[in-house]
Regions:
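Terminal signal-anchor or tail-anchor transmembrane helices
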Residues: 1-29
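N-terminal signal-anchor transmembrane helix
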Residues: 26-50, 59
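Phosphate-coordination/substrate-recognition cap region in phosphate-metabolizing enzymes
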Residues: 98
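Active-site and donor-binding regions of nucleotide-sugar-utilizing enzymes
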Residues: 14, 51-52, 56-84, 92-93, ...
Length: 272
């Protein structure tokens, strides 16, 4: 018995430094950037994943995106067609967020296409590929008023669903290689603003990158941007505190929050 315990302790001491080093590599701000030749390259379609919470989280996310796609400032404007495929993630039972996502797509996609045509960037809409979006439902990480005792079970179900979602458009034959022309790959960018589901999904992306599943870490996939809620004026949310050292960029909308010496906080003004 003593021999087994000693062996386990020795293995732990030997592997722990390597595991910590690996975690440091995938979480460093200077980690591998995607090997791309422009977001509009049809051979390298860009995949954007957006996480919607419910109520205020959804309203803020869509307000932020609406402001970006309609901005008159070219430096701040977001061309929606630059993202060949968009995945909207919602929680079970949140039909309102699903409808809001559809409404946004109906507004943003024609707007970006028309502006490209007027600017002479493309001859016709099909020159940059048809693009498309999907709305995917995952189990809630935790229901309202759900006992903390059962929260780990629901969180694990959410984690498993998020892992499957992130790998949905990948194949076993793509290890270490970029997507084939026109294929959708791992998300290139994950955009979130605080719901519990976002925390679980970001954790799932970290686990996949830790083990470099299908070359996702080597190829710089699943870079994450977290935008703290406008309602958070003096203190970060629980999701924010958990993710401030994990995401690639962490944006706050109040200058006093940027003074918190926690993680990678950046103040970029009001974004909603």
């Amino acid at each position: 018995m003593a021999f087994i315990l000693t062996t386990l302790l020795l293995l732990t001491l030997l592997t722990l430094p390597a595991l910590l080093y690996r975690l440091t590599l995938i979480l460093t701000p200077s980690r591998n950037k995607p090997l791309r030749h422009g977001r509009r390259n049809p051979n390298e379609p860009t995949h954007l994943l957006i996480i919607l919470g419910s109520g205020g989280h959804t309203a803020e996310m869509l307000a932020m995106l609406t402001r970006a796609v309609t901005s008159p400032d070219p430096a701040q404007k977001l061309n929606w067609k630059d993202y060949h495929h968009r995945t909207w993630v919602i929680s079970e039972g949140d039909s309102i967020s699903a409808e809001r996502a559809k409404e946004f797509e109906e507004m943003a996609t024609p707007l970006s296409t028309q502006e490209d045509l007027m600017a002479g960037k493309v001859k016709r809409a099909t020159d940059i590929g048809p693009g498309g979006y999907e709305i995917v439902t995952v189990p809630r990480a935790r229901e309202i008023h759900q006992p903390l005792l059962t929260a780990p079970v629901s969180s694990f179900k959410c984690l498993r669903a998020c892992r499957e979602l992130l790998m949905k458009h990948t194949t076993d034959t793509r290890d270490g290689h970029a997507a084939m022309a026109g294929e959708v790959d791992f998300p290139d960018l994950i955009l979130c603003n605080g719901p519990a589901t976002a925390t679980i999904l970001v954790l799932a992306s970290v686990l996949l990158r830790f083990f470099d599943v299908r070359g996702c870490s080597t190829r710089g996939k699943m870079r994450t941007v977290y935008v703290e809620s406008w309602a958070r004026v003096k203190r970060l949310s629980l999701s924010g505190r958990l993710l401030s050292r994990v995401v690639d960029r962490f944006l706050v909308q109040w200058p006093q929050l940027a003074k918190e010496a926690v993680g990678r906080i950046e103040y970029r003004g009001v974004l909603v």
